[in-house]
């Protein structure tokens, strides 16, 4: 898949939650929470500022991030679900 996000948008592939709890209990799909972690797949050029400059994004392709549960838009391509987020929707970089 080839996708190029615009401005300060970032495409993230959600990382699925574990199917087994730390205590060994199998978690059914109906009880799983939506993932709030993902891997950055593509990054836009940056946010245009009022003075004409562009603020370069803080995240890079390949980094793992945490984002808000209801942030962004969902996009499905070739059977894979992606999230398209604004850079401000990303809460932290993992690792």
UniProtKB/Swiss-Prot annotation:
SMART domains assigned: Cpn10
Localization terms from the record: Cytoplasm
Molecular-function annotations in GO: ATP binding; metal ion binding; protein folding chaperone; protein-folding chaperone binding; unfolded protein binding
PROSITE patterns, alphabetized: CHAPERONINS_CPN10
Domain of life: Bacteria
Predominant place of localization: cytoplasm
One Gene Ontology cellular component: cytoplasm
Key words, A-Z: Chaperone, Cytoplasm
One GO process term, biological-process aspect: chaperone cofactor-dependent protein refolding
NCBIfam families xrefs: PRK00364.1-2, PRK00364.2-2, PRK00364.2-4
Family as reported in the entry's similarity comment: Belongs to the GroES chaperonin family.
Subunit description: Heptamer of 7 subunits arranged in a ring. Interacts with the chaperonin GroEL.
PANTHER family: 10 KDA HEAT SHOCK PROTEIN (PTHR10772), CO-CHAPERONIN GROES (PTHR10772:SF58)
Function, as annotated: Together with the chaperonin GroEL, plays an essential role in assisting protein folding. The GroEL-GroES system forms a nano-cage that allows encapsulation of the non-native substrate proteins and provides a physical environment optimized to promote and accelerate protein folding. GroES binds to the apical surface of the GroEL ring, thereby capping the opening of the GroEL channel.
Protein name: Co-chaperonin GroES
The organism of origin for this protein: Xylella fastidiosa (strain Temecula1 / ATCC 700964)
């Amino acid at each position: 898949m080839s996708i190029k996000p615009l401005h300060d948008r970032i495409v993230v592939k959600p990382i699925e939650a574990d199917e087994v709890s730390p205590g060994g209990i199998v978690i059914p799909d109906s009880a799983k929470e939506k993932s709030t972690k993902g891997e950055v797949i593509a990054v836009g050029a940056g946010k245009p500022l009022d003075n004409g400059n562009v603020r370069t994004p803080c995240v890079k392709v390949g980094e793992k991030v945490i984002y808000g549960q209801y942030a962004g838009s969902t996009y499905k391509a070739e059977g894979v679900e992606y999230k398209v987020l604004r850079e401000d929707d990303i809460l932290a970089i993992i690792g």
